[in-house]
Amino acid sequence: MPPAPASDQVSGAVGAARPPSGGRAVLFAGVGLAALAAYLAWAYRAAFAHFFFDDELLYLARALAHRSPAYVFTTFVQGFPRPLVHLYFFAAARLFDAVPARYYAAGAALFAANVALFVAAARRILGGWPWAAAAGAVAGVAFFPYETLYNVAAGATELVCGLFFFATVIFYQRYRERPGPGRLALVAGALALAYAAKESALSLLPLLVVYELTFGEKGKPQPWRAWGLLAALTAAYVALEVYLQFILPGAPNRGRYMLGPLAGLNWITATLTILAAAFPPGAGALTPLKLLGWLAAWAAAFVFLKPRRERGFGLAWIAVTLAPFIFWQVPIVEAMPRYLFLPAFGFALMLAATLRDLAAKLRRPRLGWALGAVAVAGLALANGVRIPALAPRFLAPGARVRDGVRIIRANLVPGRPLYLYRDELLEPWQYAPVNAVFFGGALAPTDVLPETAADGARLLTRERGRLALLSYRQGFWRAE
């Protein structure tokens, strides 16, 4: 039998700990999930008062307007290649109709499941349940972008993918401990389902490679190998970006969207996860090299993975908020969009690993727990105050979307399609194949009035016999 991973060999005051058994485990899990639910309800109280973004209405409407799941797959799978999310969304539309609270509850439940699987995976990486629970607490209170809960389509993509992302890690950990074809099949199946939710899940393959090569055949951590792989992956991703942006003929934007995530979106999560395990207590973990590499990896994340308009802001955010152990996302929720949902879990894992290593180095376990408690409380308070403050700025247009929903739903007639114009110049490769089939209504395609790309479009509809006009401007449909 191959040796256990190095993270499972860690022992001592701040190392491994046996998991709680029986009723205690259920009690701890229940208390933790209840606390997380209470926090989400408090922190996102302002967002819950609004409806969905216009894109979410688009996907919701398609699922509501058509009885056959086959239509959902055949119609917009061409531009939105995530069949597992289609299936989730179609089922959710049937179960939840258009009631926002039901989607919020489903999103919170999916997020809680992600945290639970994350804790299970972190137990082997961090060498014990207490530190894994600490990492889960940080992820639960600090790294839940409001978009992930608020956007019923885009958020579901991240949440559903996250479930199978962490499941793949767990199955692979078990496969390493006891190899066998059955366990390998579980790894492959979970990876396939993660890919069916989001194509960037293929970046789990570098995770498995880094995991294997970092520990080596004897199961001992080899951090220099990990740093070499990090440098190689970074160089490979930069080379791919250069190719897609400057060399690839044709449609570089489409290529970047489809291929870029395969190479880089989540490998930073993978690498940071491995590095957390590559530095167990007593191995000289807290070194300038580790902290420098940590910062460099996240600088690369902001430079190469975030939208262009946010890159400069992201680098400034790193420089300004660099503080001991809590230099991320404290006052700036918008700096962590849904695209960094999985990397955020890797960051939470790195925090727990650093606190664990610090406590071991100083031989003061309580200090690590105290710092962890301060970090969790500070991040929870900061987000709980900041998110409602951001809501009027970011979500106010969403309130006007509710007017459009009310108008369209008043005209909802099963079997009679309502065509809603979507600005094809924004992302023609994604939206042109489907051209936005919306709800089930009483209008014909001639009732759609396209305008310029800057102004978007106008939709003429009827509410109880009265004409009403919806305009698409700055990303939102508004009633006029």
Model region roles, listed by residue range:
Residues 2-480:
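Polytopic membrane enzymes that build or remodel cell-surface glycoconjugates and lipids
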